């Protein structure tokens, strides 16, 4: 399972629960916090300055499972993963996202499951959907 999905989905659904209980403004506050989480990490990188190519490399680097320690040092997976999870939910809905999660129980490469469920390969999805959205959100939300 890619690190960005594990941490991003946790943030997405956690933020949904908070928003349900305390109002939509809390979702926006939590989203901002998640997106800026990387600033507490030790990379020294500024995601808001990334080019499309740098975003692609960055997202590919978050595909690993990291054996339980999903990106705790640099803290990239939380905000990036939240935004990618928002895109998955917006484009495919809850059912497809749950089908994608269930696919990790199969003896199948997750990239193939992604293509089967979303009808696009992961790299194309990064370039056509995910990266444009992530870049817009990092400009919009400071």
Residue positions per predicted region:
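Acidic/His/Gly-enriched intrinsically disordered linker/tail segments
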Residues: 1-81, 91, 101-142
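Loop/turn elements at helix/coil->beta-strand transitions in domains of secreted/extracellular proteins
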Residues: 93-96
């Amino acid at each position: 399972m890619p690190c960005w999905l594990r941490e991003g989905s946790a943030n997405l659904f956690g933020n949904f629960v908070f928003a349900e209980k305390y109002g939509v403004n809390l979702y926006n506050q939590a989203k901002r916090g998640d997106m800026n989480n990387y600033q507490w990490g030790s990379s020294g990188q500024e995601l808001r300055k990334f080019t499309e190519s740098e975003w692609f490399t960055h997202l590919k680097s978050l595909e690993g499972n990291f054996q339980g320690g999903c990106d705790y040092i640099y803290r990239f997976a939380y905000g990036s993963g939240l935004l990618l999870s928002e895109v998955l939910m917006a484009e495919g809905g809850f059912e497809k996202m749950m089908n994608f999660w269930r696919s990790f129980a199969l003896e199948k490469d997750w990239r193939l499951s992604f293509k089967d469920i979303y009808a696009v390969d992961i790299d194309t999805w990064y370039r056509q959907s995910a990266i444009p959205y992530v870049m817009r959100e990092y400009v919009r939300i400071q």
